[in-house]
Structures are given as C-alpha cells and as structure tokens.
Amino acid sequence: MSTTIVDGAQAPESAVTKPLGMRKNGKQWHAPKKAFRPGSGLTSYEQRAKTRVAQAATKAKEKELKEEKEAERKRRMQALVEKRAAKAEKERYELLAAKMHKKRLERLKRKEKRNKVLNS
C-alpha cells in the first residue's frame, strides 16, 4: 500500500479557471475564440525536423547532379572548341603549304609554336 497524501484543496484550484477580464470590443456574452489553425499540432517537431533534413539531403543531391551535368557539358563544349581550332589551323597551314616551300613552312610552324608558348 502506498502512503501518498492527497490534498483535497489542490483539485478544486486547478478546476477553477482564471477570469480573462473584459473583452476589448465589449461583447462579453460571446465565447472567446482561438485562432483557426487546422494544420498546427498534427505533426510533431521531430517529424518536421526529419522531413527538413530529408529535403536538404535531396536538394544537395540534386545540386550535385546538376553540377556534374554542367561540368560534362562544359567539357564537351571545350573539346569541340579545341577541335574546331585545330581544324582551322590545319586548313590554314594547308593553304600556306600550297604557296610556300615545305622547309620554310616547317620553320614558320616552329616559330609560331614558340610564340604561343611565350604568349601563354
């Protein structure tokens, strides 16, 4: 048997509600209303925190995938630009070769390569 003492005075105090005072608009006969928030209290804070973490993880993954896709696109574009530049240079040398002697053309190529290295 337990030896708990129950005070009879505590129960009636909690049952008595505190008066709210006079209403601002003067309609004391109306029952006080609370804000209508049907969604509040349906999900716990832990649940909301979990969903936020999950959404953040998904967003990070999506961002990573987008960055990878963009990097791949830039790499392909750069390869295409380099390929076009090489093709244009080759055509230019072919036109020069039609006009110049072979040895002179080789010297010109070497000279241009030295200038490229110096300028870059």
From Swiss-Prot:
Its main location: nucleus. InterPro entries: Cgr1-like. It is found in: Nucleus, Nucleolus. This is rRNA-processing protein CGR1. It comes from Chaetomium globosum (strain ATCC 6205 / CBS 148.51 / DSM 1962 / NBRC 6347 / NRRL 1970). Involved in nucleolar integrity and required for processing of the pre-rRNA for the 60S ribosome subunit. One of its GO terms (cellular component) is nucleolus. Residues 24-36 have a biased composition (Basic residues). Residues 1-47 are annotated as: Disordered. It comes from the Eukaryota. Residues 54-114 form a coiled coil. Belongs to the CGR1 family. Keywords: Coiled coil, Nucleus, Ribosome biogenesis, rRNA processing. Transmembrane segments: none annotated. GO terms for biological process: rRNA processing.
